[in-house]
Amino acid sequence: MDRPDLPLNALRVFEVAMRQGSFTKAAIELRVTQAAVSHQVARLEDLLGTALFLRTSQGLIPTDEGRLLFPVLEHGFDAMSRVLDRLGGRRDIEVLKVGVNTTFAMCWLMPRLEAFRQAHPQIDLRISTNNNRVEILREGLDMAIRFGTGGWTGHDAIPLAEAPMAPLCAPGLASRLLHPSDLGQVTLLRSYRSAEWPGWFEAAGVPCPPVTGPVFDSSVALAELATSGAGVALLPISMFESYIAQGRLAQPFGVTVSVGRYYLAWPSDRPATSAMSTFSRWLTGQSAE
């Protein structure tokens, strides 16, 4: 039967989206926007005349057709990559696998990745995102960017971006918040770190009201919900400067609290490779700017 001419890029985007389990994580791996991933998958579905994913409130669910297509593409792209590496003489390319906190990846690292690739083409950087603490050894990684206070047993770590936290919300809601005590009248969105809001209210000198809003394991998810006016989120300001600059979020109060910062970590007993050293120097340089 006649088959449509399927664009290789759309097939590749679908393969990555299936493997990562979300358009957001696929966008990080491919270094494009989430909208670009969604567009390419929709284009492929249109050409094939069938849905490859079900879009639900719980995320992406592959259809039977998507599950049928994925292993064929995964094997094909893997085989193609191996052959191209041999033909292109990529023996000097050094793979570096880095696990990254999702918020840091999307809000800080992604806008800078192309500059790193241009400056260091000899490093094949492979990013894996995680909303919780990245486990380097268990996940087969070389390094990880974590949020916390440092001092992880068996690991060396260097500090990166600071992350003072403050309440952020939609500008319309911010205009109605005149005093920190007013936060007791609105929904307080929260992360799984339950001490954050009480710590901020202590810094503000105001009793902490009941914090009963929905819990999220991602600051990006909290920020997106806050932009809709659904409540106030306690977020690391340095990660969401673009949201504030674009008028999507506003900071109603100047009080901040620090519960940790971002670190680059690696196992203490692992000798640093050239790629690890290069990436470490680049990250610390970018953080200092």
UniProtKB/Swiss-Prot annotation:
Where does the UniProt entry say this protein principally localizes?
cytoplasm
Keyword annotations for this protein? Activator, Cytoplasm, DNA-binding, Transcription, Transcription regulation
Database matches in Pfam families:
HTH_1, LysR_substrate
Location relative to the cell? Cytoplasm
Q: Which domain of life is it from?
A: Bacteria
Q: Name one GO biological process term.
A: DNA-templated transcription
Q: Which GO terms describe its cellular component?
A: cytoplasm
Entry's Gene Ontology molecular function annotations: DNA-binding transcription factor activity; sequence-specific DNA binding
Q: Residue limits of the HTH lysR-type domain? A: 6-63
* Portion annotated as DNA-binding: 23-42
Any idea what job this protein has?
This protein is a positive regulator of gene expression of cephalosporinase (AmpC).
Task: Give the family per the record.
Answer: Belongs to the LysR transcriptional regulatory family.
Protein name as catalogued:
HTH-type transcriptional activator AmpR
- Species, as recorded: Rhodobacter capsulatus
